[in-house]
């Protein structure tokens, strides 16, 4: 659970960093650039912590995809950037792609878990058979 929180914080810091970059480029402020560097560095650190337990493909897709979604929304609200029908379609496809990646990872994780359980069961049967043979010999 904590790794998902790391991922959420990585997304938030990435969005703050990217929006700070835009703000600094519009206002010419040095503070915005400093905030950008700190937030983006923090974002990568948190992402690295998240991928210890969250699948890399899922983590990166969420980090980048959700980040783009929020950056687009805030850019329209705060920087008066346009939001065309084409951009809305792209964002919808992005969300769909993230959902597909996430659902595909769950199935792969379940399959991998099933394989591990099967291997453990086979090993247990092997050990039990060996011990049973030794008891019969005695």
Swiss-Prot record:
Pfam families: Multi_Drug_Res. It is found in: Cell inner membrane. SUPFAM superfamilies: Multidrug resistance efflux transporter EmrE. Gene3D superfamilies: 1.10.3730.20. Keywords: Cell inner membrane, Cell membrane, Membrane, Transmembrane, Transmembrane helix, Transport. Its main location: membrane. GO terms for cellular component: plasma membrane. It is a multi-pass membrane protein. One of its GO terms (molecular function) is choline transmembrane transporter activity. The keyword Transmembrane helix applies. The chain crosses the membrane at residues 1-21, 30-50, 54-74, 81-101. Belongs to the drug/metabolite transporter (DMT) superfamily. Small multidrug resistance (SMR) (TC 2.A.7.1) family. MdtJ subfamily. Forms a complex with MdtI. Catalyzes the excretion of spermidine. This is Spermidine export protein MdtJ. It comes from Photorhabdus laumondii subsp. laumondii (strain DSM 15139 / CIP 105565 / TT01) (Photorhabdus luminescens subsp. laumondii). The gene is mdtJ.
């Amino acid at each position: 659970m904590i790794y998902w929180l790391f991922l959420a914080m990585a997304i938030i810091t990435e969005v703050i960093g990217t929006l700070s970059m835009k703000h600094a480029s519009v206002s010419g402020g040095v503070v915005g650039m400093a905030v950008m560097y700190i937030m983006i560095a923090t974002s990568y650190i948190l992402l690295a912590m998240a991928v210890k337990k969250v699948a890399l493909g899922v983590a990166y897709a969420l980090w980048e995809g959700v980040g783009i979604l929020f950056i687009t929304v805030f850019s329209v609200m705060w920087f008066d950037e346009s939001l065309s029908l084409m951009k809305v379609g792209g964002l919808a496809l992005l969300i769909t792609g993230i959902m597909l990646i996430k659902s595909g990872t769950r199935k792969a994780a379940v399959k991998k878990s099933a394989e591990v359980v099967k291997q453990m069961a086979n090993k247990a049967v092997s050990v039990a058979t060996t011990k049973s043979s030794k008891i019969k010999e005695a």
